[in-house]
Design a protein with these regions (language model features):
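Expand to "…catalyze enediolate/carbanion chemistry for C-C bond making/breaking, isomerization
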Residues: 1-154
Length: 154
């Protein structure tokens, strides 16, 4: 029985390396239900999906995640392999991140395990990114460099 939903975090907690597969761009035909079913038995600890340079395809991502669920569980007992998405927005400033926080909400709503901010130019941009990933009810770190989370809960 897995300790966590996210196998990559499990491995890191055990001081183990993690290995990924995936591309930084995808053809528009990749994010499908059938590909998700196929990838449910993948060898890698996580699957990287590049939306920084690839298409921002939420319909495809949702179908892909459904395929992963239906094709699972993984050989390690996880419901799906870990899926991490490269966020298309650049972290040039906190303002740019906040204006584009809708991308974070859309990606996380599809059931992925994590988001990678590929570039950040300041600590403030990183804080804004973390805030955009968190619900308001999660107050750990608020007042210590973080403001309230901006994701809605209803």
């Amino acid at each position: 029985m897995p300790k966590r939903i996210n196998k990559a975090i499990e491995l890191l907690e055990d001081d183990q390396p993690i290995y990924y597969t995936g591309l930084h761009t995808f053809s528009r035909d990749y994010l499908t239900y059938d590909q998700g079913k196929k990838d449910a038995s993948i060898w890698a600890d996580y699957i990287n999906i590049g939306m920084e340079h690839g298409a921002f395809d939420m319909t495809g991502l949702e179908s892909y995640m459904d395929g992963l669920v239906d094709g699972g569980p993984t050989s390690s007992g996880h419901i799906t392999p870990t899926v991490i998405i490269e966020l298309p927005v650049q972290g040039e400033s906190a303002e740019v991140i906040r204006y584009n926080a809708w991308q974070v909400r859309q990606i996380l709503a599809r059931g992925v395990h994590g988001i990678l901010l590929c570039e950040a130019s300041s600590a403030e941009a990183v804080s804004a990114f973390v805030e955009s990933c968190r619900y308001k009810i999660n107050d750990l770190g608020v007042g210590y460099g973080l403001k309230d989370g901006t994701r809605g809960v209803g």
